[in-house]
A protein has these predicted regions:
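A cross-kingdom marker of C-terminal helix-rich interaction/assembly modules
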Residues: 1-67, 71-73, 78-86, 92-214
Length: 214
């Protein structure tokens, strides 16, 4: 995909990311509009985290920095996993106590007695969105400096030759991967927002907290 074509497509993705940022900001309202619990604060902070990831993702897509964009995608998947962890943990009070004391969430257990490791949360979250596993593994490969980095910098030449880009303008070959990264980020932001919406819609506690009080 040419850079010109990429620019045309990425502008639409960026517009969608900005819409999700507003949705994440609006999602804070029912959790923090008045008295709030640790449960509310945990979910509200997840919104803040997602907004900052969007703030980072947009310039990375604009500058065509696939390595950094993929790491931000991995972080967005992590935000979904940690949000979901609150709903599947065996002991909510212990979970929140551990989180707010900067403890290890992965040492706690879910309702089936299994530790809340990233691998376990990835598996559980795949029940909501089956694309999670593949996206997580791809993004993690770039986070942890694996062969995925070589793929991102390689340029196919003639007669089975391969060139490598060291510090120059990013290859056009990564443009399609960047677009996919943007689309997936939107997908997982929507997943995060859906989880929050289910909480708000299922609990009467939030009925009169959806609009900011004057």
């Amino acid at each position: 995909m040419s850079n010109t074509k990429y620019s045309e497509n990425i502008s639409k993705i960026i517009d969608e990311l900005k819409k999700r940022r507003k949705a994440e900001k609006d999602s804070v309202i029912p959790f923090m509009n008045g008295d709030f619990t640790e449960w509310d604060l945990y979910l509200a902070v997840s919104c803040e985290y997602c907004m900052r990831l969007i703030d980072g993702m947009i310039p990375m897509l604009e500058s065509r920095n696939f390595v950094c964009a993929a790491q931000l995608l991995r972080a967005q998947i992590g935000a979904c996993m940690r949000t979901f962890a609150l709903f599947v943990c065996d002991d909510v009070d212990l979970f929140l106590q551990t989180f707010f004391s900067n403890g290890r969430i992965d040492k706690l257990k879910d309702r089936k007695g299994k530790k809340l490791t990233d691998g376990r949360l990835k598996s559980l979250l795949c029940q909501l969105d089956p694309t999670i596993a593949e996206s997580y593994d791809m993004a993690s490969g770039l986070t942890h400096y694996s062969f995925e980095v070589v793929v991102a910098m390689a340029v196919a030449g003639d007669d089975f030759e391969v060139g490598f880009n060291f510090g120059m303008e990013p290859n056009e070959e990564i443009n399609s991967m960047l677009l996919e990264c943007g689309h997936l980020c939107i997908r997982y932001l929507d997943l995060h927002l859906q989880m929050l919406n289910k909480v708000v819609e299922s609990d009467e506690w939030y009925n009169d907290r959806k609009e900011i009080r004057q």
